[in-house]
């Protein structure tokens, strides 16, 4: 089995610093496991590692997708698995780093082999959701796939749309696909959670927003708008991106933009903490305790050389 180290946790907790340290100690290669950091036009707003940080060791799957391209767990697996295999073959320790828990779960536990959904079908359901609202589509899903509807919040528009598009495109409910057996994982994983409390994170997140603005986040958003001026494009859905879009369009003041940005980031961190607290065999460690992280990685992954 291929040893991998997964470094997860809420946004702003210090995952990047931990990954760079472990990569230096264990001759590691960093692989992005964050659905927002794939977008090439938002390196500052999505807090991607700097070019200097990326030059310190191999980095993969950062800043390569266009604003109108859609990332998913399936796309992530198709890209990440060959990279993990190649880096392991070169004697480097793969480090999966990010806050998208679904991608980590797909990698370690497998994912349903759902066929690609035609863009026309996806767009149709997105437009219906925008026109009718998520609760109305949730009621429709209750009739078509009650098992999936039961576990989704009526306002969870993204997952409701996903379930309906799968139902239409494949003729089978999403719950059927999720019930199908998946092959065993080829990875031996150690999972590190960079610990943080929501109250402890909040001032750090507020400071990070100010640092992003000072680093050119507003110009970054303006440039991105010149590339794609469609707020429903996948790249614009990220926190920070959507709020800056509203500010540039004159819908909110800069102060309100920053308030919404912080509020939405905090809510996202809360959801991440809830998700990762349910993750089995996850070792929560202080982000500054690099020695403890080293011991944990040594005990499970050992040396790749």
Swiss-Prot record:
Cofactor requirement: Mg(2+)
Question: What is catalyzed by this enzyme?
Answer: adenosine(37) in tRNA + dimethylallyl diphosphate = N(6)-dimethylallyladenosine(37) in tRNA + diphosphate
User: Enzyme group, top EC level?
Assistant: transferase
InterPro entries from the entry?
Dimethylallyltransferase (IPR039657), IPT (IPR018022), P-loop_NTPase (IPR027417)
- Indicate which residues the UniProt annotation says bind ATP: 9-16
GO terms for molecular function, please?
ATP binding; tRNA dimethylallyltransferase activity
> What UniProt keywords apply to this chain's record, in alphabetical order?
ATP-binding, Magnesium, Nucleotide-binding, Transferase, tRNA processing
Annotated region Interaction with substrate tRNA: where? 34-37, 158-162
Q: Where is this site: Interaction with substrate tRNA?
A: 100
Outline what the protein does. Catalyzes the transfer of a dimethylallyl group onto the adenine at position 37 in tRNAs that read codons beginning with uridine, leading to the formation of N6-(dimethylallyl)adenosine (i(6)A).
Q: Give the record's family classification.
A: Belongs to the IPP transferase family.
The record describes its quaternary structure and partners as: Monomer.
Q: Which NCBIfam families match?
A: miaA (TIGR00174)
**Name by which UniProt lists this protein:** tRNA dimethylallyltransferase
Print the organism lineage: Bacteria, Pseudomonadati, Thermodesulfobacteriota, Desulfovibrionia, Desulfovibrionales
